Curated annotation (Swiss-Prot):
It is found in: Cytoplasm; Secreted; Cell surface. The gene is eno. The active site is at residues 208, 342. InterPro entries: Enolase, Enolase-like_C_sf, Enolase-like_N, Enolase_C, Enolase_CS, Enolase_N. Keywords: Cytoplasm, Glycolysis, Lyase, Magnesium, Metal-binding, Secreted. It comes from Caldicellulosiruptor bescii (strain ATCC BAA-1888 / DSM 6725 / KCTC 15123 / Z-1320). This is Enolase. Pfam families: Enolase_C, Enolase_N. NCBIfam families: eno (TIGR01060). One of its GO terms (biological process) is glycolytic process. Mg(2+) binds at residues 245, 290, 317. Catalyzes the reversible conversion of 2-phosphoglycerate (2-PG) into phosphoenolpyruvate (PEP). It is essential for the degradation of carbohydrates via glycolysis. Binds a second Mg(2+) ion via substrate during catalysis.
Length: 434
């Protein structure tokens, strides 16, 4: 007999994200008693194929970034349709919202409106059943804690400095548990601060908590990270590896198919881009590169995958935008070997789970990710465990909006106890073991 968890109330409001911009928060009430609350994140470097985040455009309020229209869409359009539905029917509810919107990219109601409701429904159902969210979504086999892909140095759109590439991250692949992994990252982060200070650099942080110093080149961040790993007492590559998100779509000129490294003063062809990455991978303990070429450069992606696809993880973010149509094309063409999962790129929990399942069936890894504009919401921590993804990207250990996710993962690991699994290098299950 199916439990009846009737949705009895839905309420959206405008709140602030970690950058001081408005975002949508939604509360869904089940059986007049159990509440699920979710807040929606927002990106800075967004893929052109992403679902649309609805903003008011009224320059007199929050410089046009208000979300009152999205809030109104939840309260006046979505709420009347889903009140009375069973919160356990997640797929049906998500499908109904997609149909209510009626556009390819959720531009009518806004992906921020739809996602807020989608996640709040799942949380309300989990609370009503007395289950943690990861177990409600993932079932009895949800037990894999993720390897953090921790952003500790910023350039590009996430910082005001001389580095063209956007994110330099560390991955504690040699840890034995998530709590140990987190400690290794935090220690390296603190040692990196000292390394940067010793070189005369400032140690202010960017949107995602990583340092954003005015470094001299695109390679210097790698040098200082290796030094910090060693100073923390770890072996680069064995204990802690490096991951990159250069966000090259921001450097790409579609007209001539070239990449403009403005801060470095260099222009590279797609062939030179592949060569650039191959050389860096040979020189540094890099285990993952995200968006190594631009989202529309399918030819460049093919070349990059042929050159490095067996050696390291090649993650498609702007390339796939958590979208099954884009991912299906990538799988067919044999490009990349991993997908970045951002809930707000697609706009519902159901479509997110479909993208993860499609990736896994094709032998692609999935990396669950935050956005640069975050809140205290910790849904992605539960999601990454629910789907046994094995990797999470959610910033540095230095801002509450990022640390909230790590702290939730510590709680989940503690709750799982002896059944918790920390995959380490096995998170890269599709790579040829060195």
């Amino acid at each position: 007999m199916k439990v009846d968890l009737s949705i009895t109330a839905v309420k959206a409001r405008e709140i602030l994200d970690s950058r001081g911009n408005p975002t949508v928060e939604v509360e869904v009430v089940v059986n007049d008693e159990f509440v699920g609350r979710a807040a929606v994140p927002s990106g800075a470097s967004t893929g052109i194929f992403e679902a649309v985040e609805l903003r008011d455009g009224d320059k007199k309020r929050y410089m046009g970034k208000g979300v009152l229209k999205a809030v109104e869409n939840v309260n006046e359009v979505i709420a009347p349709e889903i009140i009375g539905m069973n919160a356990l029917n997640q797929v049906e509810i998500d499908k109904l919202m997609i149909e209510l919107d009626g556009t390819e990219n959720k531009s009518k109601l806004g992906a921020n409106a739809i996602l807020g409701v989608s996640l709040a429904v799942a949380k309300a159902a989990a609370n009503a059943l007395g289950l943690p969210l990861y177990q409600y979504i993932g079932g009895v086999n949800a037990k894999y804690l993720p390897v953090p892909m921790m952003n500790i140095l910023n350039g590009g759109k996430h910082a005001d400095n001389s580095v063209d590439l956007q994110e330099f991250m560390i991955m504690p692949v040699g840890a034995k548990s998530f709590s140990e992994a987190l400690r290794m990252c935090a220690e390296t982060f603190h040692h990196l601060r000292n390394v940067l200070k010793a070189r005369g650099y400032n140690t202010t942080v960017g949107d995602e908590g990583g340092f954003a110093p005015n470094l001299k080149s695109n390679e210097e961040p790698l040098e200082v990270i290796v030094e910090a790993i060693e100073k923390a007492g770890y072996t680069p590559g064995k204990d802690i590896a490096i991951a990159l998100d250069p966000a090259t779509s921001e450097l790409y000129n579609e007209e001539d198919g070239k990449y403009y490294f403005e801060r470095e003063g260099k222009v590279r062809t797609k062939e030179e881009m592949v060569e650039f990455w191959v050389k860096l991978v040979e020189k540094y303990p890099i285990v993952s590169i995200e968006d190594g070429v631009a989202e529309e450069d399918w030819e460049g992606w093919k070349m990059l995958t042929e050159a490095l696809g067996n050696k390291i993880q090649l993650v498609g973010d702007d390339l796939f935008v958590t979208n099954t149509k884009r991912l299906a094309k990538g799988i067919e063409l044999g490009v990349a070997n991993s997908i970045l999962i951002k809930l707000n790129q697609i706009g519902t929990l159901t479509e997110t789970l479909e993208a993860i399942e499609m990736a896994n069936r094709a032998g692609y890894t999935a990396v669950v990710s935050h956005r640069s504009g975050e809140t205290e919401d910790t849904t992605i921590a539960d999601l990454v465990v629910a789907v046994n993804a094995g990797q999470i990207k959610t910033g540095a250990p230095s801002r509450t909006d990022r640390v909230a996710k790590y702290n939730q993962l510590l709680r989940i690991e503690e709750e799982l106890g002896s059944v918790a699994v920390y995959p380490g290098m096995n998170a890269f299950f599709n790579l040829k073991k060195k």
